[in-house]
Curated annotation (Swiss-Prot):
This is Uncharacterized protein MJ0835. InterPro entries: DUF515 (IPR007509). The keyword Cytoplasm does not apply. Keywords: Cell membrane, Membrane, Transmembrane, Transmembrane helix. Its main location: membrane. It holds the Pfam family DUF515. GO terms for cellular component: plasma membrane.
């Protein structure tokens, strides 16, 4: 007979085994699900983090590229700009971007220093830069320099002031080769007439700034104006080569000038003299009286006609020259010796003056001009 109690016990044991296995399976499934969920969450977090880092890196790259564009604002066509931008685009992290930016800053700083040095040299030379091979060679070497120390050594190796003075002195010598006795000199806002020897003397003492402002014009290259004035406006007749100062009657200075030629304006010469004598004679109680008179008159009319007649050989040239030669000089001398001044004499002067003073002379009435003679040949 079958033991029912054993059968029941076996069934109960079987039920417990099945129940325990199901529970384990469920637990395993649950663990797998949880682990999977955690893995998914972790993956999403990591992905989000990586995405954020990527966005941050891209933003940093954009900002860095903008910084590069600002750095190279003065040099938009510099090929180094594209090199730095490419390095930034290839960077894998912010540290690499910062390294590129730092490198670019150093490059721009050195480039600015280099250009500043070149501009300073060109500024010092001014208009003389194109005339100096030394200056151009120096600028070329600086443009190729790789460090500030190299540039500083290049600047120390040259005497820029000496080079500029040498160029200007050569220009002075070239102008003085014209052979003129006088030159119109403009320097630092002042002007004067100087001889060749005076210029050669003073050029050694003029500063570099004065030499740069120097302008020398041979008198032979100045414009000439013709002025008719009275002796009262000038005093003595000035002669060729005399340096004069021209003023207006109100005392304001107009310009310096040099007499190119001067003339006494005469149309005729007249002179008259009369002489009378009388005498009383007593003889044997009788008196006698006698008188006599004489007169001399001299008149030379149409003096310009005499000149023209001499030109066409109607009158002897040597005699006319002997008679009237240096008339103005002799007139000055006789006036000095006698202290008699003829205020009715007029002078015709041809004067060399600076080009920019021509309008000032033309617009003033010759009657309002006063001439002061500064020196004579």
């Amino acid at each position: 007979m079958v033991d029912t109690s054993k059968i029941k016990a076996l069934k109960e044991k079987s039920r417990r085994t099945v129940k325990s296995g199901s529970l384990k399976f469920i637990l395993i499934i649950l663990v797998v699900v949880i682990v999977g969920l955690l893995a998914f969450i972790a993956y999403n977090e990591i992905s989000n983090l990586q995405f954020q880092e990527k966005i941050t890196l891209e933003n940093q790259k954009k900002a860095a590229i903008e910084s590069i564009n600002q750095m190279f604002a003065k040099y938009p066509n510099d090929p180094q700009k594209l090199i730095y931008i490419n390095k930034i685009q290839m960077a894998n992290n912010i540290e690499e971007i910062n390294e590129v930016l730092e490198e670019a800053k150093k490059y721009i700083s050195f480039k600015n220093y280099k250009i500043e040095a070149i501009n300073q040299i060109k500024s010092m030379y001014g208009e003389y830069y194109s005339l100096s091979l030394s200056a151009q060679e120096l600028v070329h070497k600086i443009s190729l320099a790789q460090s500030t120390e190299e540039i500083e050594n290049l600047l120390k190796s040259v005497d820029i002031e000496k080079d500029i003075r040498s160029i200007i002195e050569k220009q002075i010598d070239y102008v003085l080769a014209s052979g003129d006795k006088y030159y119109y000199v403009e320097i630092n806002g002042k002007s004067m007439f100087m001889t060749r020897d005076e210029i050669l003397k003073y050029k050694k003492f003029w500063t570099l700034s004065e030499l740069k402002s120097l302008k020398i014009t041979p008198v032979s290259q100045l414009n000439k104006v013709a002025i008719e004035i009275s002796a009262k406006q000038c005093g003595k007749l000035p002669h060729k080569g005399d340096i004069i100062s021209i003023y207006s009657k109100d005392g304001s200075f107009i310009t310096y000038g040099i007499i190119d030629s001067s003339y006494v304006i005469l149309s005729s010469i007249s002179y008259s003299e009369s002489k009378s004598t009388s005498s009383n004679i007593n003889e044997l109680g009788e008196s006698y009286s006698s008188s006599s008179s004489s007169s001399i008159s001299y008149s030379l009319n149409n003096l310009p006609g005499i000149l023209h007649a001499t030109v066409i050989d109607r009158l002897d040239y040597d005699k006319i020259k002997k008679m009237f030669g240096e008339y103005g000089k002799k007139l000055n001398e006789i006036e000095d010796d006698t202290q008699i001044f003829d205020e009715n004499v007029n002078y015709f002067l041809i004067i060399s003056i600076p080009d920019d003073k021509i309008p000032d002379i033309i617009q003033i009435d010759p009657k309002d001009i006063v001439i002061v003679i500064k020196s004579k040949e």
